[in-house]
Every structure is written in C-alpha cells, then in structure tokens.
Design a protein with these regions (language model features):
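Catalytic core of pol beta-like nucleotidyltransferases
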Residues: 1-22, 30-34, 49-132
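Short hydrophobic/aromatic beta-strand micro-patches
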Residues: 41-45
Length: 132
C-alpha cells in the first residue's frame, strides 16, 4: 500500500468510532521520504465511557496495527502539550466530525504555543548573551 491508501484505510477504520471527534496523521508519514510507523493524534469526546481510562490509546493502536500491518503510535490531543498539539495539527487531517470544535481547539493551543515559544526564545537569547 502507498501512503494515500494507508491514510484512507486509517480514515475508514476511524470512521466507525464516534468517540473520535477529529484525527491527524503526522510525523514522518506525512513528510517526504520513508516512514517506519504512523503517528496518529486524536481528539476524543471525554464524555464517552469508552475513552475513559489509560488504555484507550493502546487498544486503538493495537486494533489499527492489526488491520494495516504498520506500527501506529496514538496520542490523545485532549491531554497533550501545546507543542505536541502544534506539531500534530500541522499534519494530515483524516477525520473531522466537528469543525467548530477543531478550529477553536487549534486556535487556543497554537496561540499558547506561539506565546510560550516567544518567551522561550527570549530566555535562550538572554542565556547566550547574558542579561542586559
């Protein structure tokens, strides 16, 4: 299977999971060149009992790996850091059941990422050159 076929298969497998509101494939899979696994970022409906507990991502990863025969790393965007959210949501959107929720989520976290990233860069510059 090529990358397009793999992404479509993952999309189809996620399609029957109403607890997943939106999902992205990111990492080496969406970049030019070879890949060893699929990085999948999901945003889930926290009110669904199915997603409560620490093993949801592991179970989803195992299910996907069985079907597509490629290792799949699943992260839950609901609990991720702003930098992980920023990187993941620059990837390939493969599922989107709520555009407004997705855009609001991304807007909030990208803003926090850029605000925080700016402060980090200031501190790095200060450390390199001493405080003035």
């Amino acid at each position: 299977m090529n990358k397009k076929e793999i992404a479509e298969k993952v999309d189809n497998l996620l399609g029957n999971r109403p607890e997943i509101i939106f999902a992205y494939i990111f990492g080496s899979f969406v970049e030019d060149g070879p890949f060893n696994d699929i990085d999948l970022a999901i945003y889930v409906d926290k009110d669904q009992s199915l997603v409560k507990g620490i093993f949801y991502e592991i179970k989803l990863s195992n299910t996907l790996e069985e079907k597509i025969r490629i290792p799949v790393d699943v992260i839950r965007l609901n609990n991720a850091s702003d930098s992980v959210i920023y990187r993941a949501t620059k990837g390939l959107l493969i599922k989107n059941n709520d555009e407004e929720k997705r855009v609001n989520f991304i807007t909030l976290h990208w803003k926090r990422y850029w605000d925080f990233n700016h402060k980090i860069q200031e501190h790095i510059t200060e450390l390199k050159h001493g405080s003035r």
